[in-house]
Amino acid sequence: YAVKLYNSFIDKAERLLSFPQIGHLENLLQHRNENFRSLVIDEHNKLVYTIEGEDIVIHTVWDCRQNPKKLIKKV
């Protein structure tokens, strides 16, 4: 499972290079000054990232089975 998750993570991260706005705006983080986006990796995980000029900053790989309030505190 770890190898599959890693490969999915790399595939999605590479896709962000071509299409940085492919992820949805992250509802849980709308109150922040930055526009956090998320991109689903698999059925349990997603990348949470921001676009800063030409850079894509991945803030966390989030396990969606966790309490959503933890995401607000973590990022």
Model-derived features with residue positions:
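Noncatalytic linker/hinge segments flanking ATPase motor cores
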Residues: 4, 14-15, 47
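A short, surface-exposed loop/turn module that caps and links secondary-structure elements
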Residues: 14-41
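A general, composition-driven signal for non-globular sequence regions
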Residues: 6, 31, 40, 59-60
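Conserved GNAT-fold acetyl-CoA-binding loop/helix
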Residues: 1-8
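Enriched for short, Lys/Arg-rich terminal
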Residues: 41-75
